[in-house]
């Protein structure tokens, strides 16, 4: 047993210090970025925000809606091969440019993903997603995926430390997904005692990945647009959002009605709800590590997307970053004990 004494920080522990700026307007800020990925050699440009690969976020409808903003969607892994084919046939090239195919690490997952990619070569991203990216089996699967799909951009996660980030990149991942336990409907930290404050994880993993020519995704922990700005400021190349995009018309959750008001169910992918839906229940050897919540219906996702992008542009103007790429270079975090005036939060 050992104890690390250095303090680890989450988004709530810091604010971004404002700096002098020559920007006259938020409209002067360029949020699009261009990346050429280490292993695939593919080049992509767009707004580096990703809708999470959750049942009630990463849907085909969400992908079509967010592509109009240049935002990516990691489509959840539970669509069939036939559903994928129908979606691809009816989607424009611009939409497909912003779509990731998600997969687990079982043999069945591999075969299904192989079929989807062979039938739809326009799809360029594969997101290999497990809750715990520290297993040897996971590293081996990433290497197998790289060998099978050499020209696809591969995302692998989740991890929270630099050495594992490096391991995944060296095994064939172009992008590493960072985050254990920060999600709004994730209970891993309280069920297992395992986790890592998200901002520190992002800072440390970004340093490791960038040293090898890879990228990272900050996955989880964002509750408001300011958190998205902090993730980018900490060095994240992409930011993945779940709860902030849940509850919309495009989210795909079950709608329930209580006392005349409609709500949409949103649940973690390791929750009892998810496991009951996809594998018939929680296995005897494990515990659910997610929860289910009811969200008031929020209408189309367009307004939320604009709010997030507007907040991000504003953050850039406060530190004088004319492009999103410059935000991390212009960011100085200050430690704080308060974030906002909460006097009217209960109203």
Curated annotation (Swiss-Prot):
Its EC number is 1.7.1.7. K(+) binds at residues 181, 183. It comes from the Bacteria. The active site is at residue 186. It catalyses: IMP + NH4(+) + NADP(+) = GMP + NADPH + 2 H(+). NADP(+) binds at residues 108-131, 216-239. Keywords: Metal-binding, NADP, Oxidoreductase, Potassium. PROSITE patterns: IMP_DH_GMP_RED. Catalyzes the irreversible NADPH-dependent deamination of GMP to IMP. It functions in the conversion of nucleobase, nucleoside and nucleotide derivatives of G to A nucleotides, and in maintaining the intracellular balance of A and G nucleotides. Belongs to the IMPDH/GMPR family. GuaC type 1 subfamily. HAMAP family: GMP_reduct_type1. Homotetramer. This is GMP reductase. It comes from Klebsiella pneumoniae (strain 342).
